[in-house]
Amino acid sequence: MIIQRLFGILYMLAGLAKAFPQFENVPAVLRQAAIANQGTWYAAASIWLGAHGDVINILVGVVLFGSGVILMLNPLWTTLVIYAQLLMMAVFVVILHQSQPQVMLLDGVFALAALYMLRGQYHRKPKPRTFPTTSFSLPTPSSESSFSAPLGDEYDVVIIGGGASGLTAASEFTHERVLVLEKSSTFGGNARYHTFNRLKHPTAGVCFQEPFPGSNMLRLLKKIGLEGKYKSNEKDTLVFFDTFLLLKCLGEIVVGFIKQPRYLLKLSVWGLTSQLFLHAIIGKPYVVAAKQLGDPIFADLYTFLDKFSPRGDFYPRLPWTPNGSWSKAHMELLDNISLYTYLFEPDKLGRLPEQLRPPARLGKLVENAVSTTLRVECLDIHDVSAYVGLHFLVGYLRGNLVTLPGGNGSISAGLCKYLSHQRNVTLQNHVQLTAVEPQHNGTCIQFTINGQPRQVQAQQIIWAAPKTQLATWLPGLPAKQLAAIKNIRHEDYYLANVFLSKPVLGHSFGGYMIEPDSNKDPFSWCKAGTCLVANWMDDHADVDVGVLTLLKPTTRSERQDRTAQNAFLALQQQTYAEIAKVLRNIGIGAEVIEDIQIWYWPAGLVTSVVGQQAEGVFETARQSFENIHFANQDSVGVGNIESAILSGIDAANAVKAQLMDTENVVEVAG
């Protein structure tokens, strides 16, 4: 601001000087220029300016003085004034350079100052604002009665936990009597959505890997009427590259395009190049590009990842199963190596089978992209294993993601709607569990509903809630299983929804924000990893407002036991600064922001670290105990909707097998 104010004073003085011909006789200067410019392509314009020198003198004086005042006051639209100054300088350099050659040096100094001021403008933090929301958001209480139906005394299956896992498990039963117990007011766990003027927006999970024929996900979507309702990000994904990170990696970019020369024939590539250098000059923080334009840079990594496609035989499935094409030895080999070492420290790798050997050299830009992709899932590139890391990179970086209106909340809503029409299933919210007591003929489950005590008898139980408190309810679990559960990591993540007075980026899914690490900001450990567009997800809403969703995951190494639980307003202001920078980069002022809501999900995402899949941590943790079976992300070790659905289906199949065995025993005894 010191330089900006200094030049603001100089502009004001220059404007005042136009009133004193003894300092600068503008009409005479313009007449001299008109003579010197004869025969040039701009001669006519120069002659016109010379003929109206007195008016031009007054106009220029007012403009210079006014722009100086603007530089001093520094309103939000100062950027436009600086661009106007640059345009005026360019015009007068063209007109005067022959008759007054010293103008090139003088205006060159002012142009450099203008570019410096532009950089400051694009990186300025907005003044703190107050917003209607002043605390972390919570799921909207259900408008329904607490009782979805009168409860019976006995059930074939009781499911504890009404998140995506529990609801999926319930949907697998067609004849058995099923009761789903949920402690909160709404079902869906971390897969929910809210609305803003009819526009659905996610409050937790957003997207999932594109399902392929025969997959559990596609079968579930078909069951609940959502097959074909999702949108793919294949052609609509943007990447927000930090400008100076991209500039530092220019050599890597050039090499990538030299290896893929056909891309040099695309006008969009040259447009991206121009955008990079322009943004580097004027200081815009991001270079925004379609994801496909980065393909040459990531070509070596993509070629390697294509060997592990979900549609092929060598996909690194989670959980690992012995009937897959990955041998246990190969899985254990990669699960005991960090992804960072595997991809970016080739000198530390021992001998690897040829099909598992990664590219010999991957650049810094690729490293940042890989790190950002995994960080969105609360995974640290140094902590996650190569096996688990490959699973995510194949699906989330190389593959296509799909989403529904409101994100994964549409899946939970679809499951609830489906189950509400199943006469064998009862959904019960507002439940507080008080006891789980195994008995000779099943298990007695005691709980309260809005403070009123109830109990039911269950032949089989599916525990679809997180396993963190299992020791309290099931102290008889084997010590090995309890130890495995204790070793499972759960990480915090935050999600911010920014409500706008008009739609923004509605043509795009949004995308990753690839930036270097910075510890200067107070919440650098909770920075935005993606900026997603609710209007694109819910494109049938046809509303005149917008919502941008910022995923703000945390990793254990960055978080270092810090939390924003009691610092909502500070985190909200940091989020405001983040989204204002994104909007300013695309030419939109922060005044379009109406509110910022933030959702805090403590211990909301399961992560798998080096060695845990090889050691069988999650396999041990999910082992059935007597008539109790387990379903949740922590049964798989992957924090996404696919693992929640898979674990729900697996638990339901285990229950069906147990019930069938019980029926067979009864028939034999009879």
Curated annotation (Swiss-Prot):
Q: What class of enzyme is it?
A: oxidoreductase
GO:BP terms for this protein?
antibiotic biosynthetic process
Q: Which organism is it from?
A: Serratia sp. (strain ATCC 39006) (Prodigiosinella confusarubida)
Cofactor dependency: FAD
Any coiled-coil regions, as ranges: none
- Output the InterPro entries linked to this UniProt entry: Amino_oxidase, DUF6041, FAD/NAD-bd_sf, Flavin_MAO
Question: How would you describe this protein's topology in the membrane?
Answer: Multi-pass membrane protein
* SUPFAM superfamilies reported for this sequence: FAD/NAD(P)-binding domain
Please name the gene that encodes this protein.
pigB
Q: Which family does it belong to?
A: Belongs to the flavin monoamine oxidase family.
- Tell me the function of this protein: Involved in the biosynthesis of 2-methyl-3-n-amyl-pyrrole (MAP), one of the terminal products involved in the biosynthesis of the red antibiotic prodigiosin (Pig). Catalyzes the oxidation of dihydro form of MAP (H2MAP) to yield MAP.
EC no.?
1.-.-.-
Q: Tell me where it resides.
A: Membrane
**Annotated pathway:** Antibiotic biosynthesis; prodigiosin biosynthesis
Q: Which GO terms label this protein's molecular function in UniProt?
A: oxidoreductase activity
Q: Keyword Membrane, does the record have it?
A: yes
Query: Which parts pass through the membrane?
Result: 53-73, 76-96, 98-118, 238-258
**Span of the signal peptide:** 1-19
Any one cellular-component term (Gene Ontology) = membrane
Q: What happens when the gene is disrupted?
A: Cells lacking this gene show a white phenotype and produce 4-hydroxy-2,2'-bipyrrole-5-carbaldehyde (HBC), 4- methoxy-2,2'-bipyrrole-5-carbaldehyde (MBC) and a dihydro form of MAP (H2MAP).
Does the keyword section mention Oxidoreductase? yes
Name it.
Answer: Oxidoreductase PigB
Q: Which UniProt keywords apply?
A: Antibiotic biosynthesis, FAD, Flavoprotein, Membrane, Oxidoreductase, Signal, Transmembrane, Transmembrane helix
Q: Which Pfam families match?
A: Amino_oxidase, DUF6041
